[in-house]
Amino acid sequence: MTHPNDHIDAMLHETRVIHPSAEFQAGTRVSRAEYERRYRQSLDQPDDFWSEVAHDLHWMKDWDRVLDWQEPHAQWFVGGQTNIAYNALDRNVQRGLGDKRAIIWEGEDGEVRTYTYAELLREVCKAANALEELGVVAGDRVTLYMPLIPEAAIAMLACARIGAVHSIVFGGFSVSALADRINNAQSKLLITADAGYRRGKPVTLKINADEAAKLAPCLEHVLVVKRAGIPLEWWTEGRDLWWHDVVDRQSDQHEATALDSEHPLFILYTSGSTGAPKGVQHTTGGYMVGTYLTTQTVFDLRDDDIYWCTADIGWITGHSYSVYGPLLNGATVVMYEGAPNQPDWGRFWDIVQKHRVTILYTAPTAIRSFMQHGDEIPGRYDLASLRLLGSVGEPINPEAWMWYYRVIGGERCPVVDTWWQTETGSIMLTTLPGAFPSKPGSAGLPMFGVEPALMTRDGEEIGDDDGGLLVIKRPWPSMLRTVYGDDERYRKSYWGEIPHVYFAGDGARRDHDGYYTIVGRVDDVLNVSGHRLGTMEIESALVAHPDVSEAAVVGRPDPVKGESVVAYVLLQDGHTADPAALRAHVSSEIGALARPDAIYIADALPKTRSGKIMRRFLRQLAAGQPVQGDTSTLEDPTVLERLQASPAL
């Protein structure tokens, strides 16, 4: 018996369809026919499909078996041995790419550093030798707490080269969050920097590292990169070591360790519903194959591309699509340390123009911020080098999608929206450019080997043009293997909600063409007068109004309707609020039941430095409750006070 609350009402229907140009289609890596052939093979003959992909890469020992699936645990390329750092560096040098640029790094202060593949290999070998000198061996955990500088990528690859398990903690996290993650992983080494730069000022990291180290007795050493050259308040002799003292004197030769395909590669902590961080554990072989294939196909990668994923490496997007995926493909990667509005809102477009970026992969929250400041700023820059745009991190509103396509892409660049998670390791849903038309706001079609479905809580499948719970019906190579130190949490969170399928925690709908649209986290679905509404749809309707640049919608308890709709809205520069017009617009786009009961006009939303809106704080404010929880990760904690003082309209 299906409970009515198993369905999510799909009420906002986007009808625009954007076709790739004939020129783009002619040169695309994967055509529609090729996608359909390979997708069918990936489901019907998965061993053959994944063997073919994996054999593009170097294996020190071939596997005995492609997949061993003992639900809910998968092992991929069983018995095989490889090394992801070897594949990202040595293999590319051997392919003749030694003189090709691997990383173009730009600091917020304008400093530029470039590493060829041969140079990057030498730096990684030196760092790997340094780690071994400090007693780090395969299987040891190493925590990175760093700004987005080349040494962060070098440290990642050095860990992977010797089989150490890296755990990267975003540089915006607090002392307690850092200490919790060090202790959970039982890391013996912390790699950090004196400081990074953000909005023209040094953001000290060593101070937080020192405080966290006091709470983490497992740490033996703290390796410090001198980024800002600021005076340090504290230095513990014997524990603290300068990167340049230890790394620079090492040999630039190092033999990569042959690692079992299932050897842990990294742990990345993500917030759970309980507030306790979950250490998502990924392994070497499957993650390598998944990120290699998706980078190549989703971004239609070509030899001369200059590829820029704007994510910090503290997040999964930075792991998979700033470092591992592009380098495995021999691409040239742009990295930028700093804020998108330093010194002004033209900084991103200056980087695109200066470095002739061809592929840009960024987040909807950044796109909406650029929208807020109008078309004129990007119009000052030459963006003609761009040929492909990508979106990641959250569902993108159709209006933001269209602005990105029109203003940044000049109506010539396909936009690939991508749905995936820390847990999935690589992109799961997207619209391959050149193969299919795009539908603004829709994540699109499944990637190779991915078999999604929409279900009710009791496992009943839901048809097209209806909303339900997004699940994945079979294992895939880059999937997480466990929650570090808590396998029961892995079983319960991902495979225990609905029997025999991976539970994504997202609501979605699928149209008659098979395109999936994410309507929001299951936790963010509102129950208004018996209707389950995705907050994403209401936000998209608000952003479609010409006065609005960004919106966040939450629910608050209502004695009559169950929940009422509360909207926090940012206006376009120079526009004024007309709450009646906004309510009427939502009513016409979706229906009267989605009309916001309260609208708050905001000058900013509570976001982390990665751009995620912290909706739990908005829910607390909407309900009139005091703000509870760690606010140290917010870009601007004072925004909560301003929102609290804002009157409802």
UniProtKB/Swiss-Prot annotation:
One of its GO terms (molecular function) is ATP binding. Residues 625-649 are annotated as: Disordered. It holds the Pfam family AMP-binding_C. The keyword Nucleus does not apply. It catalyses: acetate + ATP + CoA = acetyl-CoA + AMP + diphosphate. ATP binds at residues 393-395, 417-422, 506, 521, 532. GO terms for cellular component: cytosol. This is Acetyl-coenzyme A synthetase. It comes from Deinococcus radiodurans (strain ATCC 13939 / DSM 20539 / JCM 16871 / CCUG 27074 / LMG 4051 / NBRC 15346 / NCIMB 9279 / VKM B-1422 / R1).
